[in-house]
Amino acid sequence: MSNVDHSYTHCRGLPARVISDNPTRVYRAKPNEKCKKGYYKVMMFVCPGRPTNYIRQGDFHFYVQHGVVEYRIKPGDTQASVAKFFKIPESRIKRAGKFVVGKCIVFRANVFSHKRGWATGPLLVDASGKSIKDPRKANRNYPGLNYSRYCSSFCVKNRGIKVGKSHSNII
């Protein structure tokens, strides 16, 4: 998204700017609408700027939906605890393969992830440490940044999206 003369304290104009950056690869969708084949769901929120916020001019934040999760088993995990965390049947975890610490298992979970800034990896948990089934219902109140306003949902093509410095509209 071009960042010239824009505020992130409200949603006004942001969804249109997202689409204008990749007009053939992004379209608006309703939050519960299934995306076309080859697309995935993204939800956008803003943190209104306030003098007490870490970023006074506001900030925007995206959550990305994943139908399938690749999960590395940690010490202390059980099939039941992983199923409970992702809010899925335990049988789905059992079908994912041998349950051994350090092993990656792949299963359907239909959860969202997000990134807190450029320097972090994707997170599957909200501000309370819970899995994110619907970002609108998740805890988005992080220290200094409360992404309290839902803006829009989009469906994004799986490949070919331009972001950051790779896009000519981005400064």
Where does each model-flagged region fall?
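Active-site or metal-binding loop neighborhoods of secreted/extracellular toxin and effector enzymes
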Residues: 101-171
